[in-house]
Design a protein with these regions (language model features):
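Active-site acidic catalytic loop and adjacent metal/ATP-binding pocket
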Residues: 9-33, 166-211
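ATP-binding pocket architecture of kinase catalytic cores
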Residues: 11, 16-130
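Active-site activation/catalytic loop segments of kinase-like enzymes and analogous catalytic loops
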Residues: 58, 210-250, 264-283
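A general structural signal marking secondary-structure boundaries and capping sites
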Residues: 64-67, 118, 122-129, 220, ...
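Active-site catalytic-loop/activation-segment of kinase and kinase-like phosphoryl-transfer enzymes
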Residues: 87, 120-170, 240
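Acidic, serine/threonine- and proline-rich low-complexity regulatory regions
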Residues: 248-259
């Protein structure tokens, strides 16, 4: 119906922007309209340029053009209003991975899907300086990741400032690829066959690939802290994600996993004392995570399995 008025249905907003589902009378399909906020919805004063909407549009275009990993179809982007429109992937066909994890469905196949997706992006862009220059958004990387995760955490733990500075240096002195920047389980949609769609590319930029891996691992460990009696399933999920990613990175994989392992305690500490602490953590879990992360930052282990076993012991008897 060409002259039908569009209907905007408000969707639950994220902390970084507003969302609407757009439908047209007489049309079965629908679309999602996104608009970023400069002031993120967190208790602290967290401001980030809304130019990141253009980065997300570029990310979606790049993924589709290069067939690196499935993403929602980009319908359009308006650089003036920063409105971005993508095709809506509706339930019951698609589910956020985070919702499946919360329901107790810890499927290593889903972890493998995310690991492979990130690995394909990293391996497929590391030798393309022209593409990486288009994603040279160091200011956004600083405002979205470095400051909230490392700088603010260092301010809360001045005795660990040196260790956190070393983690930041490792992010700056290694290989560069295109990174997603926010590989949260809520940003992976899964269908019944296990096919995944990677969402929310507004944090994408030229950066260190081990940051993506460590972020993905940290989200699983934080979910593990909420379901500690499923330790075996969580261990398998984190290992599967890591191994799937490593297989895509060839000779660089092992060294990057070691870097991710050294960064991981910093990200866990940021979930407690960074700019936007994880609201789902109880006081006891915050205390356990803080103690664990502080100790591991000083030890700086580079063996992922060793760190996971220590995490299991630290979280094992939380009710």
């Amino acid at each position: 119906v060409e002259d039908a008025a569009p209907i905007f249905h408000p969707m639950p907003p994220g902390r970084s922007g507003d969302l609407w589902r757009l439908s047209l009378p007489g049309h079965e399909e629908s679309w999602v309209v996104k608009q970023p906020r400069q002031h993120l919805r967190v208790a602290a004063d967290w401001q980030v340029s809304t130019e990141r909407a253009g980065i997300e549009a570029l990310f979606l275009e790049t993924m589709a053009a290069r067939a690196l990993t499935p993403v929602p179809e980009l319908i359009g982007f308006d650089p003036t209003t920063r409105l971005l429109v993508i095709r809506h992937q509706a339930a019951p066909a698609w589910h956020p991975w985070s919702r499946l994890l919360q329901s107790g469905r810890i499927d290593p196949g889903h972890a493998r899907t995310l690991g492979l997706a990130l690995g394909r992006i990293h391996a497929g862009t590391r030798d393309d300086p022209a593409l990486l220059e288009r994603f040279a958004a160091e200011d956004l990387l600083r405002d979205l990741r470095i400051r909230p995760l490392l700088h603010v955490t260092a301010g809360a733990h001045p005795d660990l400032a040196g260790e956190l500075e070393l983690r930041e240096e490792e992010l700056g002195n290694g290989p560069r690829t295109l990174i997603h920047g926010d590989p949260d389980p809520s940003n992976l949609l899964l269908d019944g066959a296990g096919t995944g769609l990677l969402l929310d590319g507004e944090c994408a930029c030229r950066g260190a690939p081990h940051l993506d891996l460590a972020l993905a691992q940290s989200h699983l460990l934080l979910a593990w802290a909420g379901q500690p009696r499923r330790a075996g399933a969580w261990l398998t999920a984190v290992r599967t994600l890591t191994d799937a990613w490593r297989t895509r990175m060839d000779a660089d994989g092992t060294g990057m996993v070691e870097r991710a392992t050294r960064l991981l305690p910093a990200l866990l500490l940021a979930a407690v004392d960074g700019l936007a602490p994880d609201p789902g953590l109880t006081a006891e879990r915050r205390g356990r995570l803080r103690s664990f992360a502080r100790t591991q930052l000083r030890v700086a282990p580079d063996r992922a399995d060793l760190l996971l076993r220590r995490f299991e012991r630290a979280m094992g008897d939380i009710d």
